[in-house]
């Protein structure tokens, strides 16, 4: 049974005449007659009572007409869905993320993508950078979002944008730093950095930034994550540096101020298999790059 047989049958049933069906289909009458006969032979039933005035559905034909319409609609829908999938307009995108990217970058990306591609679905999983790389290679995620990914063969790391750095300090220390929020000014401050795992990391970048500015950092602690660092800062154990997305969230007993140094910024990056041809990933990257161009 072929889709063209179904189309010819439905047209003849709706027109009540094979010649009229042929004109509607923009073909000659003999192919329509032949294909309807072939369909009847395949089904083993007569679909039409034929007369000089035209054709009339038999009970079997009337029952089959509704099924034929549904099959044709399903065929059209299947074609549309397969074409949409090939363009990345539908399908599931699996994303791994780590760290402070979840505060602003990930929500902004997901919002932009779902607005642009409403037929796609998204899943998020918190995972360390090493696990993200493993998951990319295993095909369990399509994309990683984070910072400071190591260079790996077959893996692309694409910087999406840079975030300014802010000093986070307790209220009394913040008053002293506010007049000169620079890397050089931090040389006498106790630094609480994060994260402890996943090197190279944000902590390594802060240390490198300070050394490039001619400052040897006084690191008193490297803790698990940003929340632990801010907890120590609130307790007066030192100061820390955080991206703008973290500074935007108010916390008790912690004050933030943007750093004056032009170099005080860190990237947010996307990572994915270099040779990936997953359409929904390509659609996501297109949306992300358009957003990058608008910043």
Curated annotation (Swiss-Prot):
Q: Which Gene3D superfamilies match?
A: Periplasmic binding protein-like II, Winged helix-like DNA-binding domain superfamily/Winged helix DNA-binding domain
Return one Gene Ontology term, BP aspect.
catabolic process
Query: Would I find DNA damage among this entry's keywords?
Result: no
Which keywords does this Swiss-Prot/TrEMBL entry list?
Activator, Aromatic hydrocarbons catabolism, Cytoplasm, DNA-binding, Plasmid, Repressor, Transcription, Transcription regulation
Which locations, inside or outside the cell, does it occupy? Answer: Cytoplasm
Cross-referenced InterPro entries: LysR_subst-bd, Tscrpt_reg_HTH_LysR, WH-like_DNA-bd_sf, WH_DNA-bd_sf
Q: Which GO terms describe its molecular function?
A: DNA binding; DNA-binding transcription factor activity
Q: Which ranges carry the HTH lysR-type domain?
A: 1-58
UniProt xrefs under Pfam families = HTH_1 (PF00126), LysR_substrate (PF03466)
> At which residues is the DNA-binding region annotated?
18-37
Q: Which SUPFAM superfamilies match?
A: Periplasmic binding protein-like II (SSF53850), Winged helix' DNA-binding domain (SSF46785)
Task: State if Translocase is listed as a keyword.
Answer: no
Task: Please give the superkingdom of this protein's source.
Answer: Bacteria
What does the similarity note say? Belongs to the LysR transcriptional regulatory family.
**Role description:** Involved in the regulation of 3-chlorocatechol degradation. Transcriptional regulator of tfdB expression. Acts as a repressor in the absence of its effector (either 2-cis-chlorodiene lactone or chloromaleylacetate) but acts as an activator when its effector is present.
Q: What is this protein called?
A: HTH-type transcriptional regulator TfdS
Q: What organism does the record attribute this protein to? A: Cupriavidus pinatubonensis (strain JMP 134 / LMG 1197) (Cupriavidus necator (strain JMP 134))
């Amino acid at each position: 049974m072929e889709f063209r047989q179904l189309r010819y049958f439905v047209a003849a049933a709706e027109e009540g005449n094979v010649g009229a069906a042929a004109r509607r289909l923009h073909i000659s009458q003999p192919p329509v007659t032949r294909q309807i006969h072939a369909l009847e032979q395949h089904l083993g039933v007569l679909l039409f009572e034929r007369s000089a005035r035209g054709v009339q559905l038999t009970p079997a034909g009337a029952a089959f007409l509704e099924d034929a319409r549904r099959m044709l609609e399903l065929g059209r829908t299947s074609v549309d869905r397969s074409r949409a999938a090939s363009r990345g307009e539908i399908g599931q995108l699996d994303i791994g993320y780590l760290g402070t990217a979840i505060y602003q970058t990930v929500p902004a990306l997901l919002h932009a993508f779902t607005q642009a591609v409403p037929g796609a679905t998204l899943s998020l999983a918190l995972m360390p950078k090493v696990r993200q790389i493993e998951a990319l290679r295993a095909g369990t995620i399509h994309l990683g979002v984070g910072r400071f990914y190591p260079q790996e063969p077959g893996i692309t790391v694409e910087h999406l944008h840079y975030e300014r750095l802010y000093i986070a300090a307790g209220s009394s220390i913040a008053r002293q730093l506010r007049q000169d929020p620079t890397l050089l000014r931090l040389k006498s401050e106790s630094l609480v950095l994060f994260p402890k795992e996943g090197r190279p990391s944000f902590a390594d970048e802060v240390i490198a930034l300070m050394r490039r500015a001619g400052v040897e950092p006084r690191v008193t602690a490297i803790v698990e994550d940003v929340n632990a660092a801010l907890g120590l800062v609130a307790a007066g154990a030192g100061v820390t540096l955080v991206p703008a997305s973290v500074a935007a969230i108010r916390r008790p007993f912690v004050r933030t101020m943007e750093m004056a140094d032009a170099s005080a910024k860190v990237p947010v990056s996307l990572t994915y298999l270099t040779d990936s041809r997953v359409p929904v990933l390509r659609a996501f990257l297109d949306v992300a790059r358009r957003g990058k161009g608008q910043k």
